[in-house]
């Protein structure tokens, strides 16, 4: 069967830059699935994406499906014909569905009887006939939250479509896709190269587009070029470019022919906090800031043009003129804001609603202030500093700078607090209260910042759960999942002595009578334990290990973490599997027991050597392990408990638990309950698989 290279390119208006990669990857994944479902043999499926195009190139695509033999078994002969030998309705219906008459059917004889049988050789359909619908289906499944239509057409897509190129080898596959007739025409760069040209063979892509159209269609190649050229440009001015992955991706999605240029701004603007300048450069203008080797912002920036100019100084000058007013605004806001102390903004917080039922930002500030002070007392942080940080925590939201540059919240609070002469740990806490902002983000760096960050997040969790607005499905408008995980990470990774029970109760208490959910404390804790499950799964822990610990519902996060590590280590022991099975057996036996058990195991009732030996081990371990459990030394405790494998195996081998004599039976059940209680001090290992 012959194979050829296949190409599809959809030429569009400028596609959303933040969605470009996901659109291209989804297009490739969807089309690959279509090929596989159709049974079309193919090689590598390569995707291309530029601002005005999505394309796929498939190597070694078969020109048709393979031929196949089809067999369809019909009714049994007994049901296929009546007493007179005439075909039954069932037989005729089956034959009609196969496109034959009953007398054309074959007979299939087996040990179980005889059936009607249809056999046919089905010729594979051509790729040319299959591909148009496969492309259309793949495009229809793209993750596009909002479609648009253009002109008088009823066609909907993410952006208007101008060209559709469909080639199998050197042949155009005729089709109408997204309202456009397929062709071999490709559009080049808007301002360079050939605006439009034809491609003779799919193998020429993307090289022909590079040479004639001045478009780098390969997304990764374009991104790599921007990164390399920007690093070189920064090196030439003695600096290092801030090439964050997200901005690199966005810029690579904005240009077809990247040309990296270096520009500058007035040094006086460096008096403004670097974060505000960087926010303007990266967020508004998509520029790359440049730092010196000490990490200090330089009065330069790197940007990417989409055209090669004969006079690049004009482009540089134009970008400098664009950014200057934004930097001047930042300078003005910074100077204006510093005429007031942060504390002076407190009254205005009363005018901003946090949530309709939960009050204003000033109300939230009062709760955070109290809760941060309480947490500080629990973890040994400076209570006065934590209380002060709580009072000032939302004041920067009322400043001109944060109002204009919203992503500078927190960090501007830090700068203004330093200007006001606040304690350094208070100032730092104002910035770090929002950490961790995302998975893998840094945690607050000092105890006061930890107290404030936990207080802010717990206040939100308690409040939103307290009015019954917990996250549902993908909807989480108050980012409660992130808040919960943030609290857990801070407590665990900083090893803080906080209990979710008392922490949540305190957060709820501070709301007074505003909350309507009577089960808010349990709901918040259950939600946070659920985030533990997601976190530890991401960390590589097995589901049954997590379930074993969750079964004990430990509410101290640092303690939860210690149990997780202990159970994970226990699983590596040779005795683990047998003891997990034994615990499961014990759990089942005790679940079926209907008689009340004794408080203690009565030694005088023990008869068999195996039960006497097991009881002896339990007494020794009970006394030895109490300090281990009290100190959270769970890994050491489970290592000691692993020594029970032999006496437990011996017990089940030689002892009848459900003895006829009641006192013996109850004593043995009590013995097993004491065994189980020891393991449950750490986790329910009966859940381990």
From Swiss-Prot:
GO BP of this protein: arginyl-tRNA aminoacylation; glycyl-tRNA aminoacylation
Enzyme kind, highest EC tier: ligase
Keyword hit for ATP-binding: yes
Main subcellular localisation: cytoplasm
This protein's record includes keyword ATP-binding: yes
Disulfide bonds, paired cysteine numbers: none
GO cellular component, one term: cytosol
Pfam family, one: tRNA_synt_2f
EC number assigned by the record: 6.1.1.14
Transmembrane intervals: none
GO MF terms held by the record: arginine-tRNA ligase activity; ATP binding; glycine-tRNA ligase activity
PANTHER family in the record: GLYCINE--TRNA LIGASE, CHLOROPLASTIC_MITOCHONDRIAL 2, GLYCYL-TRNA SYNTHETASE
Record-stated family: Belongs to the class-II aminoacyl-tRNA synthetase family.
Protein name: Glycine--tRNA ligase beta subunit
Organism: Salmonella typhimurium (strain LT2 / SGSC1412 / ATCC 700720)
Gene name of the encoded protein: glyS
């Amino acid at each position: 069967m012959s194979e050829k290279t296949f190409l599809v390119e959809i030429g569009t208006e400028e596609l959303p830059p933040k969605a470009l990669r996901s659109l291209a990857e989804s297009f490739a994944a969807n089309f690959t699935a279509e090929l596989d479902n159709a049974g079309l043999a193919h090689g590598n499926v390569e995707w291309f994406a530029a601002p005005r195009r999505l394309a796929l190139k498939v190597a070694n695509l078969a020109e048709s499906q393979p031929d196949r033999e089809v067999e369809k078994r019909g009714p049994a002969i007994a049901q296929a014909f009546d007493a007179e030998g005439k075909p039954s309705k069932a037989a005729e219906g089956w034959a009609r569905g196969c496109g034959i008459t009953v007398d054309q059917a074959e007979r299939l004889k087996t040990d179980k009887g005889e059936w009607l049988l249809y056999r046919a050789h089905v010729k594979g359909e051509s790729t040319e006939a299959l591909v148009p619908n496969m492309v259309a289906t793949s495009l229809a499944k793209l993750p596009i939250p909002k479609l648009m239509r253009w002109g008088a057409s009823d066609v909907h897509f993410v952006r208007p479509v101008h060209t559709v190129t469909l080639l199998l080898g050197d042949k155009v596959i005729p089709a109408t896709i997204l309202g456009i007739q397929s062709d071999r025409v490709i559009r080049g760069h808007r301002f360079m190269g050939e605006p439009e040209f034809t491609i003779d063979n799919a193998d020429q892509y993307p090289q022909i587009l590079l040479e004639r159209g001045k478009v780098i269609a390969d997304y990764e190649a374009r991104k790599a070029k921007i990164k390399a050229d920007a690093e070189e440009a920064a090196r030439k001015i003695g600096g290092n470019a801030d090439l964050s992955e997200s901005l690199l991706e966005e810029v690579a999605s904005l240009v077809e022919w990247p040309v990296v240029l270096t520009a500058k701004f007035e040094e006086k603007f460096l008096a403004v906090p670097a974060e505000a300048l960087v926010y303007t450069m990266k967020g508004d203008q998509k520029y790359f800031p440049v730092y010196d080797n000490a990490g200090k912002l330089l009065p330069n920036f790197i940007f990417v043009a989409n055209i090669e100019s004969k006079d690049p100084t004009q482009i540089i000058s134009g970008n400098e003129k664009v950014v200057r007013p934004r930097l001047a605004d930042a300078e003005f806001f910074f100077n204006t804001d510093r005429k007031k102390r942060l504390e002076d903004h407190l009254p205005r917080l009363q005018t901003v609603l946090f949530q309709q039922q939960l009050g204003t930002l000033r109300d939230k500030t009062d709760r955070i202030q109290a809760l941060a002070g309480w947490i500080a007392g629990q973890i040994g942080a400076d209570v006065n500093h934590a209380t002060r940080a709580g009072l000032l925590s939302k004041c920067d939201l009322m400043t001109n700078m944060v109002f204009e540059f919203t992503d500078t919240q927190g960090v501007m609070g830090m700068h203004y607090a330093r200007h006001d002469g606040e304690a350094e740990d208070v100032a730092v806490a104002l910035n770090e209260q929002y950490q961790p902002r995302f998975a893998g983000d840094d945690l607050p760096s000092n105890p006061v910042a930890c107290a404030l960050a936990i207080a802010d997040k717990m206040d939100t969790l308690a409040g939103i759960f307290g009015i019954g607005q917990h996250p549902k499905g993908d909807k989480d408008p108050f980012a409660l999942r992130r808040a919960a995980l943030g609290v857990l990470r801070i407590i665990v990774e900083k090893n803080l002595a906080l209990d979710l029970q008392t922490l949540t109760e305190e957060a709820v208490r501070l709301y007074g009578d505003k909350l309507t959910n009577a089960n808010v404390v349990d709901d918040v804790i259950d939600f946070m334990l659920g985030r533990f499950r997601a976190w530890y799964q991401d960390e590589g822990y097995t589901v049954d290990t997590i379930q074993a610990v969750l079964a004990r519902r430990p509410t101290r996060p640092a303690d939860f973490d210690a149990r997780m590590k202990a159970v994970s280590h226990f699983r590596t022991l040779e005795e683990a599997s047998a003891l997990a099975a034994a615990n499961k057996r014990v759990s089942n036996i005790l679940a079926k027991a209907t008689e009340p058990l004794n408080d203690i195991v009565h030694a005088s009732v023990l008869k068999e050597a195996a039960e006497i030996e097991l009881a002896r081990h339990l007494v020794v371990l009970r006394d030895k392990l109490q300090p281990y459990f009290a100190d959270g030394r769970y890994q050491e405790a489970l290592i000691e408990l692993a020594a029970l494998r032999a006496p437990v195996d011996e017990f089940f081998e030689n002892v009848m638990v459900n003895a006829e004599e009641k006192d013996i039976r109850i004593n043995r059940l009590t013995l097993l309950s004491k065994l189980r209680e020891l393991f449950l001090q750490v986790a329910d290992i009966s859940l381990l698989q």
